[in-house]
Amino acid sequence: MIAEINHVTLIVDNLEAAATFYENEMGLEPVPAFVFDYPTAFFRITDTTQLHLSEWEDTRSFRGHLCVRVDNFSELFYRMKKQGRIDTAPWGKVRRLPDGAMQAFIRDPAGNLIELTSFPDDEIDPAIFDDELYEEGLYVSGRNDFRGYKAENATLYHPKK
């Protein structure tokens, strides 16, 4: 069912230091992030995989997660909902991102946080947009800290170079 890893998010305590390390020492290319209200930086790992850095003061990593693009977002959404695996606590409800990709967070049996995403143009069951677990717009943390490289046209998917 999983088609590929889309991105990995790491929680950091100093965005600037971490971003400098991944760009200068690891050779990753910075790419625009969505316009979140908290410090974040996105990097291209491959044409289809990104590293996301988010600055938080978490004592346990309940926001750090693995993101996978799935073949059929709607089918998996309903299956995970039935199993009670959808977790809206760390990053909010199921959403359509500005680029059109869908986003949901689930917990695996061990409690690891996994983000499910679709391609921006994938067909999505319209009933999901009326579900109590769906919410319009980007997640808002209330921090109003907009540090990091961000753009209105950010996407999880980049064309091959």
How would you label these PLM feature ranges?
Residues 128-137:
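Short, compositionally biased
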Residues 52-54, 105, 115:
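Conserved beta-strand in the GNAT
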Residues 15, 66-113, 121-124, 139-161:
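Vicinal oxygen chelate
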Residues 47-50, 59-61, 71-76:
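Short, charged/polar surface micro-motifs in flexible loops or helix N-caps
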Residues 5-7, 61-66:
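Eukaryotic phosphotyrosine signaling hubs
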Residues 35-40, 60-62, 97-102:
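Short acidic/glycine-enriched loop/turn segments that link adjacent beta-strands
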Residues 2, 9-50:
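Core segments of cupin and vicinal oxygen chelate
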